[in-house]
Regions:
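The canonical Cys-X-X-Cys-His
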Residues: 10-24, 76, 90-94
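Short, flexible coil/turn micro-motifs enriched in small/turn-prone residues
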Residues: 5, 18-23, 55, 64
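Hydrophobic aliphatic residue packing
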Residues: 13, 56, 60, 87-90, ...
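Flexible coil segments in periplasmic/lumen-exposed cytochrome c-class electron-transfer proteins
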Residues: 1-4, 67-68, 74, 78-137
Length: 137
């Protein structure tokens, strides 16, 4: 898929699945829903971060974490029903800072999503937290 097509597909998945909680610009709501900007871009630049992002979308996420110095302790539901191509598209869209920075992080492919799922077949919303790369916040 061409970069523009991938961005459009990712934007559509984001609008339909993510924006209701994280907001239309992915800024989040402090204390309730984290921003999806800086950390998603940073995570998408490293293999372990890419696996974490794929598994968060696949399994959901439960437990305490900090994003930008703000604490969160909630539940993100698994985004069931998304194809590997849709997961790749939405994560690539987020990793490019909502399509504004194509050089933000490498795009993910459906094959990347499939490989991450194969590496972590037994993850759940609770155990996916352990995949999260260390961050300064």
């Amino acid at each position: 898929m061409a970069a523009g097509g991938a961005t459009a597909a990712g934007a559509t998945v984001f609008a339909n699945r993510c924006a209701v909680c994280h907001g239309p610009q992915a800024a989040g709501i402090p204390g309730s829903f984290p921003s999806l900007h800086e950390q998603v871009v940073a995570f998408a630049k490293v293999p372990e971060g890419r696996d974490y992002l794929v598994m968060v979308v696949t399994t959901g996420l439960m437990g305490a974490l900090k994003v930008g110095g703000v604490s969160y302790n909630g539940v993100m539901p698994a985004q069931s029903g998304l194809s590997e191509a849709e997961i790749a598209a939405v994560l690539s869209y987020l990793a490019s800072d909502l399509g504004r920075n194509e050089a933000g992080a490498p795009a993910l492919s459906a094959a990347d999503v499939s490989a991450a799922r194969a590496r972590h077949p037994d993850k759940s919303a609770q155990s996916t937290r352990a995949l999260r790369p260390a961050t300064e916040s």
